[in-house]
């Protein structure tokens, strides 16, 4: 059961990678890849919300009136894990492995929960392509940075709504 949960997650990652590849290939085909800012990030580290044994239906973990999933339910629906019939989540042991070398995971303000990847590709401004950086970044810095790169002022109004001041730089 545990392996099937990770197999489903790995399938999701593989599918996501293929779709990102399709976008990159298309941008290359139309000769716009080097004129495009590509930003890829995660909102948090791996999640332990699957608990000790994983969940076939993660929504049930929020339902205090129904019994939680157990291994028997997951085993009974083994072939459905990863399909449109499940809203599954892998066990927390996989979350630990997903965050290596960082301890803990999403929900905790500890390395495994808050140190997540950010990849930005824009050859016009990033000269040392492929460099791995260790300094912290915060999502509030992305929009101001992109506006600066594109030499665009932050609009004061959007569709008649006054925009708040940006806190990033």
Task: Put a short name on every predicted segment.
Residues 1-2, 54:
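N-terminal leader/propeptide and maturation segments of large enzyme subunits in energy/redox metabolism
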Residues 3-15:
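The substrate-binding groove and active-site-proximal loops of carbohydrate-active enzymes
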Residues 27, 31, 56-60, 153:
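Beta-rich accessory regions
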Residues 46, 51-65, 161:
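Short secondary-structure boundary/capping segments
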Residues 3, 25, 64-169:
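Substrate-binding rim/cap in mid-to-C-terminal beta-strand-loop elements of soluble/periplasmic
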């Amino acid at each position: 059961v545990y392996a099937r949960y990770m197999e489903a997650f790995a399938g999701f990652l593989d599918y996501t990678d293929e779709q990102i590849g399709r976008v990159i290939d298309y941008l290359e085909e139309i000769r716009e890849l080097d004129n495009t800012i590509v930003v890829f990030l995660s909102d948090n580290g791996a999640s332990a919300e699957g608990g000790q044994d994983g969940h076939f239906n993660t929504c049930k973990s929020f339902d205090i009136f129904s019994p939680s999933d157990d291994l028997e339910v997951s085993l009974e629906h083994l072939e459905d894990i990863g399909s449109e019939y499940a809203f599954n989540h892998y066990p927390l042991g996989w979350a630990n492995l997903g965050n290596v070398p960082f301890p803990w995971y999403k929900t905790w303000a500890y390395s495994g929960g808050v140190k997540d990847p950010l990849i930005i590709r824009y050859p016009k401004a990033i000269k040392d392509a492929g460099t791995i950086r260790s300094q912290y970044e915060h999502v509030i810095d992305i929009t101001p940075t992109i506006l600066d790169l594109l030499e665009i002022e932050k609009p004061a109004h959007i569709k008649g709504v006054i925009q708040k001041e940006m806190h990033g730089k």
